[in-house]
Amino acid sequence: MIKGAVFDMDGLMFDTERLVYENWQSMMDEYGYPYDIEFFKQTVGKRKKEVHLMYLSRFGDDFPYWQYADEGKARYVEHIKREGIPVKKGLYDILEYFKGSGVKIALATSTSRQTSELNLKIAKVSDYFDALVCGEDVKNGKPHPEVFLTAAERLGLDPRDCAAFEDSINGIKSAYAAGMTTVMVPDFLQPTDEIKPMITHLCRDLNEAIDQIRNS
């Protein structure tokens, strides 16, 4: 049995990638920039500094990325405070399962601590987590393993005794490089041929992930 469970957040715990995409699509339509979901998919799992460069490359050096990112975040916060946060199937079950089994739980996300803590609070899952590792806590974003190695360290565990739960390609690369058991629950992105050998368990949802971990 694993001793630690390390969760990505957006797209894995919460159906927030779609909210972010819808905000960007709405803003880009309003401001007259051609935009589509395929470009957005390329940004999934990357840190904002990387995404910033992608937008400049696509839309020009004068593209006001940070202005739009701030506006998008404000729209996002307003939405989840008003409507709540969309929780992925099986999230409460898997957190309860690990907590009841004595497994330590950490968050490993490229999202800011402020937004991460707000998401956890609104979903009422903050108390399940023994450690949070957020975007500003590491120098290197996924696919570098730093975020997962830091999560294991904060849990006081060897990474090899932990399972990482991810929905993104970069996330799986990061967790695999950290030496963790990897569990992929795809959201926007399906596993590529490159990362399939890196995936220990490929699951439809977090309920199936419980079964896979329990039976492994």
Where are the regions a protein language model picked out?
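Helix-loop "lid/cap" segments that line or gate small-molecule binding pockets
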Residues: 27-28, 47-61, 119, 151-152
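Short beta->alpha linker loops
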Residues: 19, 46-47, 86-90, 111, ...
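Asp-based, Mg2+/Mn2+-dependent phosphohydrolase catalytic module
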Residues: 1-3, 96-99, 112-216
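Short, surface-exposed acidic
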Residues: 33-41, 60-69, 159
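Metal-dependent phosphoesterase signature
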Residues: 55-93, 101-103
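Active-site neighborhood of HAD-like aspartate-dependent phosphohydrolases
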Residues: 1-42
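Conserved SAM-binding loop
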Residues: 13, 87, 105-108, 140, ...
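Residue-level detector of anion-binding/catalytic polar loops
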Residues: 34, 104, 181
